[in-house]
Amino acid sequence: MKREGIMVGEKFLPADIIEHVLNLRRLGVQKDIWKGYDGYSWMYTCMPECGYIDIVCYRGGLQQDISFDFGTSAAWSVAVDEYLKLLD
């Protein structure tokens, strides 16, 4: 059964956001803003030179408490591995 996302610490990261960021990373995109299925706006930032990855949620132009500062590509990889295990 496919789950709708994963918990990262105390926060829920929706599956559609994970999938979108995975696609952006495959394409080499370093920054993107889009509207998720939840109606929130999401911003992804990646700085490949240092491995920094940040995913921030906005509603009405204001940053929400739902943000994910992975800090490194390794931390993002751990989250993705957890997500992929749920798909099996």
How should each PLM-predicted stretch be described?
Residues 26-80:
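Acidic, low-complexity, intrinsically disordered interaction modules
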Residues 13, 69-71, 84:
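Compositionally biased, low-structure terminal segments
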Residues 18, 22-25, 77-87:
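Residue-level detector of alpha-helical secondary structure
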Residues 2-38:
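Negatively charged, low-complexity tracts enriched in Asp/Glu with abundant Ser/Thr
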